[in-house]
Amino acid sequence: MDTLTAPTTQSEQPPPPLTASLSRRYACDRCRSHKLRCNRDLMTSTNSPCQRCRKARVKCTIGASIRVGLSPEELKNGENVHRASPGRSAGSHRTASTPSNHAPRSHGRTFTPESAHQAPPYPSNRSMSGSMRLSPVPWLDMISFDGAQELNFDGSTSGLPMGSHTNGSGPLHAPMGGSTSSNTSSTFLDVRPPLHTPASSKPQQEAWRTGDDSTDLRLLSQIPRTRGGGVTDPAAGLTQQHPAGVTSSAPLVSHDHAFAPPQTSIISEPIPGDDLPAGGRPPTWFPARSRAGSTPSPTELKDACIQKLSDLSASLMKDLDLIITCKTASSFLFTPSDKTAAGYLFKTLDGSMTEDNAVARMLYGSERFLDIIKLFNQLPSLPSSSLSMPAAAAAAAAAASYGSTRPVDSDDAYYYSDLEDTGDIRSRNPTPEDRGNEQWSILQAYLGRAGQGPPMGPSQGSSSRSTTTNCSSSFVEVQKPDVPSILVILSCYTCLLKIYETVFFVIQHVLECSPANPSGTTDIPHTVRDLNINGFFLQNHRTLQIKILIQVSTYMLDSIQKSLGTILSDSMFQALLKTLMKEEGCTITSQGEETGMQGVRDLIRRVEEMLA
């Protein structure tokens, strides 16, 4: 007779034994990542790929699935094991047959930081009495040490006083040290991370992970501190005061946005030269001083002008070489019989329809030369000696008002005794100003004995001041252009004159080859293209374009001559200019200043007469 037995409940059924390969997922990795149903026949073979992977011609893999949760044995025994600890779960599966015998967990498996943060702060010491329990987390870089602490081999920390760190509430959250086994010589540490890691320790943990030693220094340098030793929170606007010798256990910076890079002085510093007057303000290409807010010195301004003149000279030389080459080629390749005026002017001026128009580059170069010369003339005077007139005059006036009757050849004892008899209270303790005045009077007396100037005495009165002013004025000379300035200005000046001469020579030759009435012909090419006056274009008025070019060129030449007034009068500039004109075969005026513009002005006048 068959007896009916009571059905066993699910909790009383023994758990099924697991194989060494652990449980396997039904869906493959590719279908799980795409969230698709895996059409895989497990009845045929466990190693056969699914239909989707076979169709995509990819390798079908199934990752191992580790059981998550507590085993019935652990629930029955009541052991405090966290449900998210894979190490403990795997250990419980391996010891399912003998749940009371717990072997030490192996650290060969892979652990994640998430599982470490979810671990309890203190391990259970059940069945672990008399021995040290190892931490399931095998890394040490999750500990957030303070900047002044060092981890010793005995588990203690050394460094600056930690204040409230001694009670275990500081940045060193894990219990260091614990207990030491009596039968072993090595020390084991429980370095379990805390349950809640502060947000401020994330950069420090990253620094420990990557080995970056400069992170702590950057964090400390970004904290604004007050005079009382407190740390100011830039986000909350609060100041925490700490007693002397005690380091706060609070996080250094409690907000992630507080780690923004500080503003540098390079962005906010003023542009050098902005404080110059409006009349003599240099352009943006002038050199800047290394110190922010300082005005460039006259020497730097002059060097910048010379550099710009050198660049302009190189550009003008290229333009001059181009126009001379075109003029020579046009003259030799074509004869006046088969050469039209339009073709001649077009080839000589290198294409008036392009940006390389010789007329446009001539006027543009003249404008740049005028701008640089105006700035060059506005440079302040440079003294030829380090002793300036105001300082010397002030020292001489102070020495004259001192009223000392000391002979130059007397000794100091006689001098001080004389001052004491006259009741001068400064004889006992002479000030540095008095000593400077005395040295200045000695210098003046030495110059008088040497025949370089009259000696200064107390009886000269007002004449001493005028003598001092005259002597001091010899230290400052009138500004004269130096040799580099003269050479670079002369180079630009001669190139411009040669370009003007070549352009108007070509225009004159074109007008000579034109019909008798040049005002009615249309064979003259454009010299001033796309010029209009409120919609009135000059396309059909070729001679009017030449007249406008004559007026503009005359104005530019007059402006250049006026700006070079002081430089043209220099003897060295005149000598070099006359030498160049002799080499070119130009006529030189015997009297007066030589400007070199006479040949260009004659050409302009002849062209203007032909258009009249």
UniProtKB/Swiss-Prot annotation:
Xref: SMART domains: GAL4
Biased composition (Polar residues): 1-12, 92-103, 154-169, 238-249
GO molecular function: DNA binding; DNA-binding transcription factor activity, RNA polymerase II-specific; zinc ion binding
Keywords: DNA-binding, Nucleus, Transcription, Transcription regulation
Gene Ontology process terms (BP): positive regulation of metabolic process
Transcription regulation keyword on record: yes
Highest rank taxon of the organism: Eukaryota
Annotated source species: Aspergillus flavipes
The protein, known as: Transcription factor ffsR
Function: Transcription factor that specifically regulates the expression of the gene cluster that mediates the biosynthesis of the cytotoxic leucine-containing cytochalasans, including aspochalasin C, aspochalasin E, TMC-169, flavichalasine F, aspergillin PZ, aspochalasin M and flavichalasine G.
A Pfam family hit: Zn_clus
Predominant localisation class: nucleus
Biased composition (Basic and acidic residues): 73-82
Region (Disordered): 1-21, 73-130, 154-249, 451-470
Gene3D superfamilies the record matches: Zn(2)-C6 fungal-type DNA-binding domain
One GO CC term on file: nucleus
Residues of the DNA-binding region: 28-60
